[in-house]
Amino acid sequence: LPPLTNKPQQEVTGRTNPGNTVTINDAPAQVAQDGSFKGTVTLKEGLNTIIVEAKNAAGLSTRKLVTTTLDTTPPNIFIDDPGYLVDVTEIEVTGRVEPKSKVTVNGQPATVTHDIWKAVIKVNYGKNTVTVIAIDQAGNSNTATKDLLVYKRVIINLTIDNPVPTINGEPQAPLEAAPFISGGRTMVPIRFISEALGAEVKWEEITKGITITLGDTVIAMQVGSTTVMVNGKSYTIDAPPVIKNGRTFVPIRFISEHLGAKVDWDESTRTVTITRDFIP
């Protein structure tokens, strides 16, 4: 018998002297002419003691005790949260499992130390499914999954009176007009900033209207007007859109934040930094 199994039905085999009778847990076993015997036992969950007794024609008997453990419970699997993932192609995933289990993560063997498993996996932008399969010593298996999101980050830097912006540290083509401050608000070219954030910009020449669309967000504004509509809701901004050197400029914080970006201002360098994490 195996010392540990997940199969309740087990065959017990052995050999005794020819002519002996054998019982296994008081149930008669089949004994061949050469003394080999076999019988079937049904195990209960946990530790089982099997009593094999052989008796000769004179009535003398010999007993042997064999122990085996039945474990039919699949191993629990825990997957740790790897945290917020940005611009990564490879990550280490970790978790816990029943000690001495064999673990695979997305088909690759994981390292298991006592009850801690870990593995390095490849990831892509967007949703990634981590599939963990664990097989314990008894042969029971279990599967757990966890969806992870990997974001792409865009960082835009614009400096007041400097026409050269940067995106993720790379200088871009000079703008027709540099960012400037109006009414205490930093004004930036709407088309550049919107498209850099992944939005679509439409210009209506007759009404001087601007429509910015990003996913489910639609921002509508008009040159010279402090009223802005965001998904049909009206807002009032401090500085209206203006046209400078043939380009439309808008207050950066209002637009960026409604497009899901974070805006930071460095007074010492007069630089505005716009950061947006998104799923490509």
Q: What spans do the regions from the language model cover?
A:
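Primary recognition of N-terminal secretory signal peptides and signal-anchoring hydrophobic helices
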Residues: 65-69, 74-76, 87-90, 96, ...
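Ser/Thr-rich low-complexity repeats and stalk/linker segments
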Residues: 1-151
